[in-house]
Amino acid sequence: MARDDALKDKIIKLGNKQKVSAVIKYSDHPNPDIRMTVAMTLGMIPTYDSGMALIPLLRDTDPMVRASASTAAADIHAKHCEEYVKKLAFADNDPNVRQAAKSAFDRLKSSVV
């Protein structure tokens, strides 16, 4: 548990330094909490590459990762994620994911970049 907390802190620090490629390396970590942290961190880095890295996380098996990725996509105005977020908002099995994705989708479709 302590190792995971330390890894989450490391990922957030990498995000604060805008190190997208270093953050992306953890996007396939076996622990969903780590992948969720990756999604949230990518939401702090408003680049095309961050948005592209969110796409696999929007398809993650864990609902909290999908919800975090949809929110992160809206946070960075990743218009190229809009269709993926829309699918989650209207078709995901998990009601929490649908709620987070619906909010994110509304923000994405109204944002102008």
Region locations from a protein language model:
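Short, Lys/Arg-rich amphipathic alpha-helical interaction segments
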Residues: K87, A91-S111
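Conserved hydrophobic register position within alpha-solenoid helical repeats
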Residues: L7-K10, V38, A69, A101
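Amphipathic alpha-helical scaffolding segments comprising HEAT/armadillo-like alpha-solenoid repeats
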Residues: L14-S27, I45-R59, A78-F90, S110-V113
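Mid-chain, well-packed structural core segment of small domains
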Residues: P63-I76
